[in-house]
Amino acid sequence: MFRKLTLYLFLLLASIGLTYDTQSYTSGALSGSAYGIIGLSTLIALCYILPGIFLVRYLGKRWQVKPLVLIFALIGGVFITGWIAGYANTISHDWVTAHLSSKSFFYRFEDALMAPLVEEPLKLAAFLFAIYMVPTKSYKELLLVAITAGLGFQISEDRKSVV
């Protein structure tokens, strides 16, 4: 029962993330030249995305990792961690600017310090969800699932920087 509830929560968060990530493309607010720039930038990003996915697929076959766990990790990394990290970074930035003086060390380096504190636990959550839904035991499998969740987050982050 708890596994089904977790799966439904994952699907809900992934649906929200898919809507959040594609909203700027589907709203019709961009000009034709902006869509052209987005298309060209996407083609450039595919130069590392496709080899990365093929490498994960190759290592998954070689190390006998269940493909479903890699799919969960990739979807979690792409559609869940990205939009939550965006909101969490905004909230943490607002908190730091409201509660700390501009002379404090943490205030000055907030951009460099808060992003890892917010984003890394979210990548860990995508990893933990994937291995909870499809249990894996060997260290090679766990490493590949973690790499896949990180690759998914990187894809999401690069797609957001284009728009």
Where are these regions (language model features)?
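Hydrophobic alpha-helical segments at protein termini of multi-pass membrane proteins
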Residues: 1-163
